[in-house]
């Protein structure tokens, strides 16, 4: 798994595309550069997020 920050969520997967168009289209997931599973679609946090719907994400990091 690449060491990248995931800030995008499409189809239940996080993508490392940092607000580019692929974040909207889901291309970053389709072309194999997904790097994790979204625990919260609105928050787009990585697997370690335990804040639930009360968290906010900045560059892949959760903050309750």
From Swiss-Prot:
Keywords: Metal-binding, Metal-thiolate cluster. One of its GO terms (molecular function) is metal ion binding. It comes from the Eukaryota. Induction: By heavy metals. Metallothioneins have a high content of cysteine residues that bind various heavy metals. Belongs to the metallothionein superfamily. Type 4 family. This is Metallothionein-A. It comes from Strongylocentrotus purpuratus. The gene is MTA.
